């Protein structure tokens, strides 16, 4: 794998939001079926939610350490649409009252502003993520906003696309 040393953007060019993509595996660990999340969502960021510890020494100097991140990402609205395997899977978890299944998702973040189509884009695969349904309802359509809590059980790698489907390859150890 080629080592990336810069973004695949021109000097001073801002990365379009659509280049940061979140996929959820709605298949099995053996037969992955990646669902791209974000259709109809105008704004979604991965909030890092850092845990910090600050100490002021006897000289009055404050130092702050980041001890961990608890990253999460909200998708609101997440409108129920025909053909949405993720919405159907979450709806089944809701109606079957099996919330323990909400913490067993594989989520992949693809950074399409790092890498190339030929060599692959930088990505990370996270296992045992939680996808929480925050509500269900709406006004004109049935929305089911979700929040993904990332696990930090992650593997870095690259993604290439075959027939519009992402294929993840872990980095060599």
Describe these PLM feature segments.
Residues 59-126, 156-162:
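Extracellular/virion structural assembly segments
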């Amino acid at each position: 794998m080629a080592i990336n040393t810069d973004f695949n953007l021109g000097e001073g060019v801002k990365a379009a939001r659509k280049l940061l993509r979140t996929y959820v595996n709605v298949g099995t660990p053996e037969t992955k079926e990646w669902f791209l999340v974000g259709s109809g969502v105008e704004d979604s960021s991965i909030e890092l939610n850092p845990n910090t510890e600050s100490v002021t020494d006897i000289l009055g100097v404050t130092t702050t350490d980041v001890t961990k991140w608890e990253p999460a990402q909200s998708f609101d609205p997440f409108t129920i649409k025909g053909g949405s395997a993720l919405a159907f899977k979450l709806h089944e978890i809701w109606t079957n009252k099996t919330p323990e299944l909400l913490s067993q998702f594989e989520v992949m973040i693809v950074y399409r502003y790092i890498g190339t189509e030929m060599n692959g884009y930088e990505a990370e695969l996270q296992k045992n993520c939680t996808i929480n349904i925050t509500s269900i309802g709406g006004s004109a359509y049935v929305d089911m906003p979700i929040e993904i809590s990332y696990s930090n059980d992650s593997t870095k790698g690259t993604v290439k696309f075959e027939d519009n489907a992402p294929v993840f390859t872990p980095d060599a150890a």
